From Swiss-Prot:
Gene that specifies this protein: dapE
Function: Catalyzes the hydrolysis of N-succinyl-L,L-diaminopimelic acid (SDAP), forming succinate and LL-2,6-diaminopimelate (DAP), an intermediate involved in the bacterial biosynthesis of lysine and meso-diaminopimelic acid, an essential component of bacterial cell walls.
Assigned protein family: Belongs to the peptidase M20A family. DapE subfamily.
Organism of provenance: Coxiella burnetii (strain RSA 331 / Henzerling II)
Official protein name in the record: Succinyl-diaminopimelate desuccinylase
Pathway of action: Amino-acid biosynthesis; L-lysine biosynthesis via DAP pathway; LL-2,6-diaminopimelate from (S)-tetrahydrodipicolinate (succinylase route): step 3/3
UniProt entry keywords in alphabetical sequence: Amino-acid biosynthesis, Cobalt, Diaminopimelate biosynthesis, Hydrolase, Lysine biosynthesis, Metal-binding, Zinc
């Protein structure tokens, strides 16, 4: 059994449902310490984090990832227990197999092998690992990055081991991510009897035109690196608990996924202009869960693409598709951030899995990238 597969199995066996680490980080820390890494455990609240490094020079390249996973859902729908790593037809099944315990296993084994072969290597290799990526992400990578900045530790390059590939390992890497902003909107009307609408003000009826305008608005055209900004309602609630009552309020929740084309303030102002145009009485609360970032095709991305070409014989596609990741926190330091990991088709799904052959290739890609960088 390969070292990467063996480590992945150990990690899958730990039911690390966010924010519980379930001992995964102890396994990783012990392995890294055994090859000379210095490690710091950085707990914040109930979240486990660690920071590890080997070397004392620049450039500083870090691997970043998370040990927490989403709940398995209905376990009767799994063909094997979600926290029992199971090999079948060349694949290994288990919660976290794709997102992202395989990435963690491959990064750690690649770093171990590199340090063993190059004990006096140039540069510094580091790890940021958290158990708070699938949850609120308030006490995880963000707090570790704050800690590193307080210590004046300058990061140059970062590989996030998220499942970035689409159909084949290495066919895509992320060189940026869109931002995410939520809005909670309350439309205020006047409650009344449903038989006497002239004595009430129905917030549901009042909202229709404004909601249609918001849904149809073209916020931007996107650009060569980012798709157009997306606006989606995901929850609408109204009602007074009785069939003969016009409700006093309607509550709606919506989300923006946006490129660096806009600031959050610009999007907020545009929403409020539309609501004001339709003369709505409203209250709105905003929550910016992540800012967009774009690292572009820098030195790290160039070497990662070279490593993928050498090992997988693919011309990888750099893109910014998908949701958010902890890369957004690390990008605030000014370092180049890319995401490179296994195929993402089964992430968060029942019977989550990864091709076993991809584990060795992914380990080799990380190893080769280290060779090229330092």
């Amino acid at each position: 059994m390969s070292e990467t597969l063996n480590l992945l199995k150990q990690l899958i066996e730990r039911p690390s449902i966010t924010p519980n680490d379930a001992g995964c980080q102890t396994i990783l820390i012990d392995r890294l310490k055994s090859v000379g890494f210095q490690c710091e455990h950085l707990p914040f609240g109930e979240v486990h984090n660690f920071w590890a490094w080997h070397g004392h020079q620049s450039p500083f390249i870090i691997f970043a990832g998370h040990t927490d996973v989403v709940p398995p859902g209905d376990e009767t729908q799994w063909h094997s227990p979600p926290f029992t790593p199971t090999e079948k037809n060349g694949y290994i099944y288990g919660r976290g197999a794709a997102d992202m315990k395989s990435g963690l296993a491959a990064m750690v084994v690649a770093a171990e092998n590199f340090v063993k072969q190059n004990p006096d290597h140039n540069g510094t290799i580091g790890f940021i690992v958290t158990s708070d990526e699938e949850g609120p992400a308030e006490n995880g990578t963000q707090k570790v990055v704050d800690y590193l900045q307080q210590k004046n530790i300058k990061l140059d390059y970062c590989i996030v081991g998220e499942a970035s590939s689409n159909e084949k390992l290495g066919d895509a890497i992320k060189i940026g991510r869109r931002g995410s902003m939520h809005g909670e909107l309350t439309i205020i009307g006047k409650q009344g009897h449903i038989a006497y609408p002239h004595l009430a003000d129905n917030p549901i009826h009042r909202s229709f035109q404004a909601f249609e305008a918001l849904a149809k608005t073209k916020w931007d055209e996107g650009n060569e690196h980012f798709t157009p900004t997306s606006f989606q309602f995901y929850n609408v609630e109204a009602g007074a608990g009785a069939a003969n009552v016009i409700p006093a309020t309607l509550k709606a929740k919506f989300n923006f996924r946006f490129a660096p084309i806009h600031t959050t303030q610009q999007l907020q102002q545009k929403v409020e202009r539309i609501l004001n145009y339709y003369q709505l009485n409203y209250d709105i609360q905003w929550n910016v869960s992540s800012q967009p970032f774009f690292s572009g095709n820098g030195r790290l991305a160039t070497f990662v693409r070279q490593a993928i070409q050498e090992i997988c014989h693919l011309n990888t596609e750099p893109n910014t598709y998908g949701g958010t990741s902890d890369g957004r926190f690390i990008a605030t330091t000014g370092c180049e951030v890319i995401e490179l990991g296994p195929v993402n088709k089964t992430a968060h799904h029942v019977n989550e899995n990864i091709c076993i052959a991809d584990l060795e290739k992914l380990t080799d890609i990380y190893f080769r990238t280290l060779q090229l960088l330092i």
